[in-house]
Amino acid sequence: MAAAAAAMATATSATAAPPLRIRDAARRTRRRGHVRCAVASGAAEAPAAPGARVSADCVVVGGGISGLCTAQALATKHGVGDVLVTEARARPGGNITTAERAGEGYLWEEGPNSFQPSDPVLTMAVDSGLKDDLVFGDPNAPRFVLWEGKLRPVPSKPGDLPFFDLMSIPGKLRAGLGALGVRAPPPGREESVEDFVRRNLGAEVFERLIEPFCSGVYAGDPSKLSMKAAFGKVWRLEDTGGSIIGGTIKTIQERGKNPKPPRDPRLPTPKGQTVASFRKGLTMLPDAITSRLGSKVKLSWKLTSITKSDNKGYALVYETPEGVVSVQAKTVVMTIPSYVASDILRPLSSDAADALSIFYYPPVAAVTVSYPKEAIRKECLIDGELQGFGQLHPRSQGVETLGTIYSSSLFPNRAPAGRVLLLNYIGGSTNTGIVSKTESELVEAVDRDLRKMLINPKAVDPLVLGVRVWPQAIPQFLIGHLDHLEAAKSALGKGGYDGLFLGGNYVAGVALGRCVEGAYESASQISDYLTKYAYK
């Protein structure tokens, strides 16, 4: 049960729409200096790199983490160096946004906060020259869920199950029996996350563990999220093994029969189940890849059209700071959000465009605040310190905030001595009204929630460091998601648009790590296509 819950709660969002500027408003919270607010899309254009390219083996549309990693994977794993990455905005990295007040000792994230240090992500980091900049969280740091007014630790391993108080004894027994297969059989249709978890593990696991994890990972509604699409690894356990435990045993047996190849000796070995970042924040990764790719990355290049060329490949037309530029490409991979890809692809295939337009991205706001250490409630301290990854809030518990990450506890050098840094997420599928709130209203909502369980009600007002609203933040893997994605790919194939690939988080998954893994998968597909068709 603990393993299943953990597997469903490990993702971190990785791409989003450009943020929305929040109008300045009078705030009741005390502030020092400049508050970093959201920046509207269409930042000042950067000049194109000298020596504009007019052709490429592969054009990567989108300079977020998926696109940049695809380009680097093509070069490092497949020897495909004739690649062009085009980004409409003036900076690379998508919604990876690290902010800093260097003089005051604050460093924080306004998009994704961390990643699971899987081997593909570590490989990308090492290949980008960032091995020595990796930082890892404490694998023993607790995670908390708010329940009945109290922050309760979440079990991190099966041995913790008898001792944690988030669930009742009957709830634990129900979960254990369900995991063993004593539960109703699958219904023969695509299940929502809620239906799957309630059927397999019971109401308590869903309401007290999985529902808040869905809010924290997807900012989504678990009654609408597809179990198969959103948490496929756990779904496959039952599908292949007859039950969650049966599938786990079968997976272990299969691994024994098919051992992994030797691990790359260059990669560091994280201790336990943890998360990671970089010394100066997540933005170090896209910046490092961009630096290595050099003039192959074009910023402020807005794609206006794409057409199939008569001599194979594709012709792409861009508006750039230096005028209109046409690019001829043997292959194209679109790593932009699905709703942007839909508009661009509509002249090629209305069926593909229609399928891509279905995917939903709810709004999410990231609100970063700091309190003095003494503002933390004593009962929330461990050995006199705020320790842990953070906390999640079930929608049933009467708070608006989805969850809070203890940024200053998770990684070093994120806040000055004597201060705690908290990154709070608010909004999502069940609270879309945040886009109409002012900056001060969002801060007040976060501060009000924190004073219910973590912050002393009489503590001083927080120092507000950043408020960033992502109007279209995280793609929702709803029931039917995989069918819609397959429909889009099939429509492109039937239309004769071979060599045109779809990528990004709505394809690979919302976690930053899945975006990197998906980039390696896309690079392999592109390389195979070039070898079989385009190079002949």
Curated annotation (Swiss-Prot):
List, as start-end ranges, the regions of compositional bias called Basic and acidic residues: 252-266
InterPro entries the record matches: Amino_oxidase (IPR002937), FAD/NAD-bd_sf (IPR036188), Protoporphyrinogen_oxidase (IPR004572), Zeta_carotene_desat/Oxidored (IPR050464)
Is Transit peptide there in the keyword field? yes
Kindly list the GO CC terms recorded for this protein: chloroplast
Any single GO BP term: chlorophyll biosynthetic process
> Which cofactors are named for this entry?
FAD
| Binding residues annotated for FAD, in chain numbering | 62-67, 87-88, 111-114, 510-512
Give the EC number(s) under which this enzyme is classified: 1.3.3.4
* Cellular location(s): Plastid, Chloroplast
As one GO molecular function, the record gives: flavin adenine dinucleotide binding
The job of this chain, per UniProt, is described as:
Catalyzes the 6-electron oxidation of protoporphyrinogen-IX to form protoporphyrin-IX.
Q: What is this protein called?
A: Protoporphyrinogen oxidase, chloroplastic
Originating species: Oryza sativa subsp. japonica (Rice)
